[in-house]
A protein has these predicted regions:
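Short glycine-/aliphatic-rich beta-strand segments at the starts of folded cytosolic domains
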Residues: 8-26
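Structural detector of well-ordered beta-strand residues that form the stable sheet scaffold
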Residues: 76, 179, 241-243, 267, ...
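Subtilisin-like serine protease catalytic core
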Residues: 101-113, 117-131, 142-191, 210, ...
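Active-site environment of divalent metal-dependent phosphoester hydrolases
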Residues: 120-121, 248-253, 274
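Catalytic-core environment of secreted peptidases
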Residues: 125, 130-131, 272-321, 345
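Hydrolase catalytic cores
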Residues: 157-158, 179, 183, 299-353
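Substrate-binding/access-modulating region of protease and related hydrolase catalytic domains
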Residues: 183-263, 287-290, 305-321
Length: 353
């Protein structure tokens, strides 16, 4: 069976004429290239090397016609991924900041953030070590303090350079090196193929990362066998810790999307101020009945200072995940050799159920 089962179920109830953006994956690059040669009239939008696959637009009939093709490993929908942050409310004037007594600051830890770009010009990110990678050539109007994208908020939670009354940076890991993988585009919508292109870039350019933070998730639940989840598992095998939100589609069970359902990513849910699971936080199990999320961090009504006159009150599992990424960066600074499995052992021994 070559059609990904959740996608096949969806196809059964949709019209014959509808065109789908689909990802076709293969066991290896050789099979992919043989397929392209065999079906040379097929209009291929993109090719991916890290996990051998192509992006094409197909009708329902075409998808089922390819189902018996031996060269194909799997056909699935190129699903849209959504930022896992809820409403943002602007609040004027800053309060005093919580004193930080942590001796580690994430120094020399490399964190890749896959999101819609980071505005490093805001005061909160002043002098943060940041390297930009732009996936698409799209011009965005950048205002010095006005471009507050989802990615900017995520980076501000991790590396905020505002100081508390004792002169400590309030960011959880203010000295990490941030790699900004900006997947923003002209239609302001993101799909699996955007993240797969980032993975190709990381591998092709041999970008050395310790942590990858994917702050996006699908609406549809996943069993961890979709292409993006499988790609995350493969990248994790390169000793990169991948961290994802559980999504904001709770409180029902089976609301973990992709890539949060991947077996080798650390999936994080959100807690409210009383340290109870937030109502919106995605719940497990995954579609194949594995326990997720792996951890929960505070993610409801978190105040994030952006400028001297502006702070944001933010909620969402991506907010909780940014907090988790900061904590993981501190641990990574302490033990640069720690792996995903050892990190999970550490969390499992210290977490409160």
């Amino acid at each position: 069976m070559n059609v990904y089962p959740p996608f096949k179920d969806k196809l059964e109830i949709l019209s014959e004429d509808q065109i789908f953006s689909v990802l076709v994956s293969f066991d290896d690059l050789s099979n992919r290239d043989k397929f392209i040669k065999k079906y040379n009239r097929l209009d291929i939008i993109s090719k991916f090397d890290f996990i051998p696959s192509i992006l094409v637009n197909l009708k329902k009939e075409q998808i089922f016609n390819y189902e018996s093709e031996a060269l194909i490993k799997q056909i699935e929908e190129n699903q849209i991924v959504y930022p896992a942050m809820l409403d943002v409310n602007k609040i004027l004037e800053l309060d005093d900041y919580k004193k930080s007594e942590i001796s580690y600051t994430g120094k020399n830890v490399k964190v890749g953030i896959i999101d819609n770009g980071i505005n490093e010009k805001i005061p909160a990110l002043s002098k943060v070590s940041l390297k930009k990678f732009k996936l698409y050539d799209v011009e965005k109007p950048i205002k010095e303090n006005g471009e507050i994208s989802h990615g900017t908020v995520m980076a501000s939670i991790i590396s905020n350079r505002f100081e508390d009354s004792d002169g400590n940076y309030i960011g959880i890991a203010p000295n990490v090196k941030i790699y900004d993988f900006d997947i923003s585009n002209s239609h302001q919508e993101h799909s699996f193929n955007d993240i797969l292109r980032v993975f190709d870039k990381i591998c092709e350019e041999q970008i050395n990362l310790d942590i990858i933070f994917i702050s996006l998730t699908t609406k549809n639940s996943s069993d961890g066998k979709d292409l993006l989840s499988l790609a995350c598992d493969l990248l994790s095998d390169k000793n990169i810790i991948i961290v994802c939100p559980s999504g904001n589609f709770g409180p029902n069970y089976y609301t973990i999307g992709s890539p949060g359902a991947a077996k080798k990513v650390i999936t994080i849910g959100a807690l409210d101020k009383e340290l109870s699971i937030s109502n919106f936080s995605g719940r497990g199990p995954t579609l194949d009945k594995r326990k997720k999320p792996d951890l929960c961090f505070p993610g409801s009504n978190i105040l994030v200072p952006i400028t001297n006159d502006l702070r944001l009150n933010v909620s969402g599992t991506s907010v909780a995940t940014a907090t988790g990424v900061g904590v993981i960066a501190l641990i990574k600074e302490y033990d640069s050799n720690i792996t995903h499995d050892l990190l999970m052992d550490l969390f499992n021994k210290s977490k409160i159920d």
